Amino acid sequence: MGGNSVLEIVAYGAWNGGTVVDNSIYEKKGLSFKGGVPVNNKTIEERMGVRTRKVAGTDERIGVTALQDLLVNPDIDPSRIKLVVGATNVGDDKYDPGPLIRFPYEFLREHCPNAHVMDLYAGCPGFNVAVELCFMLSLSGFLNTGDITVIVGAENIHRAQSFQPDNTANIIFGDDAMATALKTGVSHSPGGQYFNDQTKNFNTTKDPVTAMAEAIYALNGSKKFDGLIVDNQLGNLIYRVPATAARVQHALVKLMYPDEAENGLFNRFRESLGFYDQNIRAFAFDIMTLDPKPKKVEALAKAYVQSGKYNNIISVFLAPDASGTISLHRGTDFTFKRPPTGIIDTLTSTHGCYADYIQALPMGDDVFGDMDGKGVFLYATRGAKSHLNELLSPNSITMDQIDLLIEHQANFAMIPLTLEQVLELPKDEIKPAVADLVANKLVTNVHERGNCSVVCMQRLPYDLKRGALQKDRLQGFKINANLDQLKKANLILNDSVGAGMTRSSFLQKL
């Protein structure tokens, strides 16, 4: 590890199995995209960039396999593992009440029985959000020098039957699982003053989202907040996709800004995006602790405050019966000191006004995923500029200084359009610059593995390091054209977007 780093990614483990499934299986189903466009190999690649994806066996717990592979690494001492996070959404079984991390953790329990263990629900950016959580815990002194965090990402979309059989969303997803070890370096003793003097209990028989928003508003009024963390023990997919915290965030925003809610501002995409970027600027995600107690989520919120990056955090413990406890956490005089190496900065932003863009819905006696493809595409491409500027500018970094961009592989068509929004160049220079960046600074695998949801951020650097990526062309762009140089990258930007809607990013300096 670098001598002055606070947190570094030190090892990966992977599930490398599965059956390769090409587009012919969907072509044979006789499906159509919106507008009556027939589903075939050509239209799938043109719209999504996907040629093949991996499908796991029906009897595999692929997250366990990834963790086992990680622990083969002789540099990982399981007794030093202090935090285990399951960054996932659906996992192996959409009916599983969670926490989904309990299956991998059983493989670890004897080595680290006192570890903090939890799921984290934040859509596809879940890994990045988990990295930020670990960064906060390291900055605040919750994690100490030499402590190891393990983040397990596992999405078995096909086994879980996440979408209805005739939903074209099935086409884009692939199964995957990775386990990542992060080590805390320099330990910090936080200065400043921490306050947690406002709490409120709630109990409801109505919609828990409304109940939580009203209880928070009664406690905090219209005061701004930097983040909302919910320990969500409801144990139902419809309350974790999107994260319940994202829906609570927006319900609270409507109480804070009743005039804007009344005039329908939040139903107009461009206006609501600008309003959130200017007035809200807060993250929202769920956890589900293995041994649930209100004090656990409160300890995490405290760490965010003590990191110096955030001043006002709301924590909620939501019990299985929809009762719970809300706490306000605030701090003064804590200072965020950017480390020179390792993870140097992070940022997560949630726009809960778009929570319906990706959601799990009850359908008859079952539950299935539902996506507003146009809305997701708009948010992914139009929401990046403000978010990335907020991360890069305080670090005096510009996009052209990034050596390696690890971008979520939701849909290849999103990536060039996102970069067109982000790059600050004259109009006639944008497209050539984007093509150069895609070819020489970006790693791509969506054409071979599909959208692997939360696992993308772990899979891409792992496959780069082991030489599993190949030069190719996709939708008219050269891809993976500079792999040898990217293996030597010094400044790395990880960026992901997904349900919530949430965007989460972090910077690494090696």
Regions found by a protein language model. Give the residues of each.
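Structural signature of outer-membrane beta-barrel domains
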Residues: 14-16, 157-158, 235, 412
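Membrane helical hairpin/interfacial module
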Residues: 78-91
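Condensing-enzyme catalytic core mediating Claisen C-C bond formation in acyl metabolism
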Residues: 1-57, 165-206, 210, 222, ...
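Claisen-condensing/thiolase-fold acyl-transfer catalytic domains that form or cleave C-C bonds
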Residues: 60, 64-67, 90-100, 111-112, ...
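Amphipathic alpha-helical segments in well-structured domains
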Residues: 100-104, 174, 178, 245
